[in-house]
């Protein structure tokens, strides 16, 4: 399951723009994405691939709950802040994915995370989620063989995220990760969190009380072990804590198309034509091989 936007943003910033003339179209994100996919497919031999897509990068229903959600990334209107040279490549990326036999899958009013969450939930044969987004750690499930191939350090330095990884790094289980993120907040998504509660305190609360509902119940119990300072902060954040979990947790029951049952079947002629037209033939050859 590809978090496609996460990958093409990484490709755009990680692959040099080698245009030789000012009027040549930018292609570094597209070629970089193809090279990433070639490496992933070569090294992991997936039985099938789904390119999950942001049909709405900032769904209104999430904004209605937390107004600051991704607010700092809005360029104008409701469009995401994105370099023009990357924006120009989105149609090329879509066309290349279609040519590969991996057409993007998006659901109106939802993010790629929600598409990924749904496929990961309904899969019955193990799933690798390829992303640079920690939010998807909430999907990790050893029993169902769902793990994250975390690309924050680059595609050549993938971190394999399983339950032990999440526990060692954050002190919580994957099923507690979304609640920890709610308490801690996430500046990259515009989530304020609860003042005075960082990652370690959030993890400690969840270990003591199980989940966010357990923490909230403990806040109302004067005999619980929550310190007066933390109790006061949690009480003051009641409205946020009521709304944020729905924003942070990925949707897992979208009406997605049936997952492919085998490896992608590329349209070689289309891919070669794209490679020739945009000067990315080397990347096309690598992924076809």
Spans of model-derived segments:
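Non-catalytic nucleic-acid-binding/docking modules located in mid-to-C-terminal regions
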Residues: 45-50, 81, 143, 160-289
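Noncatalytic, basic helical substrate-engagement surface that gates or grips nucleic-acid strands
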Residues: 1-130, 134-156, 241-257, 261
